[in-house]
Amino acid sequence: MIPGEVFSAPGEIILNDGLPVTTLVVANTGDRPVQIGSHYHFAEANPLLQFDREAARGQRLDIPAGTAIRFEPGQSREVPLIPYRGARIVHGFRNETGEAL
């Protein structure tokens, strides 16, 4: 064994298996790229991203931890969102929530 080595089960690992997925169309209406990380409360993302924020409340991107999605100026794309789990209390970010979801 090598320090830090990970032994995973054989076969494909499915992230967030069984969680409901919400797909939203997101458009960057700004003049600069915007990048959103995997665990950012999507409803509180950059105000220049245009999408249904109410549908995104309590959700984050359905992408591997530590990764992000980048939106170039003028770009529009679909993104998969999944609900936060656990106590579902969101603090920080743009400070628009700060309460249980």
Swiss-Prot record:
GO terms for biological process: urea catabolic process. Pfam families: Urease_beta. Its EC number is 3.5.1.5. The keyword Nucleus does not apply. GO terms for molecular function: urease activity. Keywords: Cytoplasm, Hydrolase. It is found in: Cytoplasm. It catalyses: urea + 2 H2O + H(+) = hydrogencarbonate + 2 NH4(+). It comes from the Bacteria. GO terms for cellular component: urease complex. It is an enzyme of class 3 (hydrolase). Its main location: cytoplasm. SUPFAM superfamilies: Urease, beta-subunit. Pathway: Nitrogen metabolism; urea degradation; CO(2) and NH(3) from urea (urease route): step 1/1. Belongs to the urease beta subunit family. Heterotrimer of UreA (gamma), UreB (beta) and UreC (alpha) subunits. Three heterotrimers associate to form the active enzyme. This is Urease subunit beta. The lineage of its organism: Bacteria, Pseudomonadati, Pseudomonadota, Alphaproteobacteria, Acetobacterales.
